[in-house]
Every structure is written in structure tokens, then in C-alpha cells.
Amino acid sequence: TLRDLVSYNDKHNDANGEDNNDGESHNRSYNHGVEGPTDDPDVLTLRARQQRNFIATLMLSQGVPMLLHGDELGRTQQGNNNGYAQDNELTWMHWDAVDQPLLEFTAALARLRREHPTFRRSRFFNGRPVRREEGA
């Protein structure tokens, strides 16, 4: 999840019953100084900023923005990067734990994207030059 991307350096797949051997071990994530949950306000501020950075990059890029369910709400799988066998609290939505500022930020970017065509291609990319002089 997006929240896990900024909260964990390592996978935490113990609940999957495979001794944490399943799932990719190279997460390409960064915990910003604390593995998992924290009360450190500096770490929490940085994590929130990074989530907004990632959402903005996604929403302002060309193509169809793809979010994992709950990324806009701050959903976490507690560092489990392979929740394939988890039909339980780990992968369910927790509507009582919605990150309202992140949801509002994501909604504002979705509105911006919808209202300004510059953030959306009007035609499918075909590889041809955009300007006449590039391919004339």
C-alpha cells in the first residue's frame, strides 16, 4: 500500500504462514527512520508529505492513474507485501481509520485532473512526433 511504502523498509509477511519467505524481499520502500507505526511527529509529517508527493506524481502524470484500494484513505497492510491469503483485518478497509487530509488532497487532485485537460491526453500515444519539425 502507499502507506506501507513510506512506513516500512522490510516486508512483514509472518501472518502468511510461510516464515516471511513469501513476497518480494526488496521492497524499494523507505520507512523514514522508524520501521512501522510511530508516534514521532517528525516522521509522521515526512511520511504524510511523501504520500502526497506520490499521489501528486500519479495524478498529474499522463495515463490512467491507478491506486490500490484504500491508498487515498491511508490504508495499511502493516508491511505485508503479499496479502494474497489474507481475507481478514489485514487487508480489509478500516473505515474508522481514514486519513481525512490525504483523502481530501487526493480528491482535490482528481478534480484538478478532471477540470484541466492538460493533465489528460486527448488521443492515445502513437509514438509520432508532437511538433511538425521533429518528423517533417
Question: How would you describe each model-predicted region?
Answer:
Residues T1-A136:
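Active-site and adjacent substrate-binding regions of carbohydrate-active enzymes
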